């Protein structure tokens, strides 16, 4: 045995499985302004104490490994380790706890959501000591936020670019989402924009398929944008989906969109990845393009109540990575979204400072230190009868996006767009006059339909449509 080995053995080095709570559960720790704070919903395996479960999360998502290693002595683990500093039981749930973990900022690369997530929501989610694990919220410190560009432009700059103020923006996803030729697709875009919408949108899975290659779609949509602008006198846009199989191909599509002179492109930020998304956001700021973000795949991550990650965390990550719009659910349509919880992360997208409010799912006070805001996009199973509720819930700084609620109009796409625009203008006017949209919404829509045959037809078609299913989990 070498002298060095003998020395190590003599001071108590011992192989074996670690008891994490001895080093990583530190209830006496006072968090720093520079720490990233995380709130995890922890479900330990039977027989695992909550303190050990919380400590294992802190360890496995920072400096820990399952046994003592010689190289622990070559660095300051106390400086770099994550710490579980508080644990509380979840009310009404058996064997579930909220474990609060603080991470020193040195653990994370500047300006990289990819690196932050690789640590905090990485291998620890498969740890055997835990039956389930869910990241409920993150507090991003000011020092780390300042290493990100964030959204390419933000809410105010977008309004200035579009010259549109005092109301939500209106959009429409072109349907059917797959199968149209580029020319027919462009025709649908033109009809919707001419009818009064601000934007139309590629569906998230429209990339470059055999029936419609991306370059053809971009050209026909650009023609539709410019023709509708000339006829209406309003600035129009279509979310051209630049998502591709490689970052290089994605950037090629964004460059072509800029060369065409269109105002906005789109990215599927979860399936495309945060590295690609951040690269595209930087390009969009440098080249004057707005960036619309779709959240395809989010429900795989956030729908389970005790495992995965809440969408408010994905929303915060998107604001760091960059996007001017992001889909946020509707509260009233076909996709899941509880009102208070949804409005909680909508505020985290838009506002510069958001106070802790557990009733809305906000575990930490978040200061965005003037990082530009993101417009929430309400989309999924909505129609004209939802307009008062959507206007009241989301306010002016939002995009209300009707796919089937535009293209399903019995008279065609342009009348469907007219119906939505008339309904929106009626709701905004009524709100500005002091009327209660929540209580008088249906009456406001009926009054407007008396002088808009397009709206009257839409009201008749969708008067019985609801998406109401009992929650089973």
Swiss-Prot record:
The keyword tRNA-binding does not apply. GO terms for cellular component: chloroplast. The disulfide bond which can form in the large chain dimeric partners within the hexadecamer appears to be associated with oxidative stress and protein turnover. Residues 1-2 form a propeptide. Its main location: plastid. GO terms for molecular function: magnesium ion binding; monooxygenase activity; ribulose-bisphosphate carboxylase activity. It catalyses: 2 (2R)-3-phosphoglycerate + 2 H(+) = D-ribulose 1,5-bisphosphate + CO2 + H2O; D-ribulose 1,5-bisphosphate + O2 = 2-phosphoglycolate + (2R)-3-phosphoglycerate + 2 H(+). GO terms for biological process: photorespiration; reductive pentose-phosphate cycle. It is found in: Plastid, Chloroplast. This is Ribulose bisphosphate carboxylase large chain.
